[in-house]
Design a protein with these regions (language model features):
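Nucleic acid-binding interface residues in structured DNA/RNA-binding domains
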Residues: 1-9, 13-16, 20-82
């Protein structure tokens, strides 16, 4: 995995220690990542979920926009489920 993807993954893991709901886009923006391809988002998400099995991936889509117009990068939320 490339360094920038590892930075995102490590930041997600740090955020998971204090938050039950993690907005993927906000975490990426906080470390300076402006965009990721969908495949890269999926790789990071799968690695995070494997290491944190209590989290689930949810895609929040705005009610006034079609799902085709919104990327996984901007809409992915990792939510802790017990």
């Amino acid at each position: 995995m490339k360094e920038y993807k590892l930075n995102v993954y490590n930041t997600l893991c740090e955020t998971a220690k204090s938050c039950r709901e993690i907005h993927f886009y906000d975490v990426c923006r906080s470390i300076g990542v402006k965009h990721l391809k969908t495949q890269e988002v999926l790789e990071i998400m799968n690695k995070f979920i494997r290491s944190n099995p209590s989290y689930r991936a949810v895609q929040f889509i705005g009610p006034k926009r079609t799902s085709a117009a919104q990327s996984l990068f901007t809409t992915l939320v990792l939510t802790e489920c017990e």
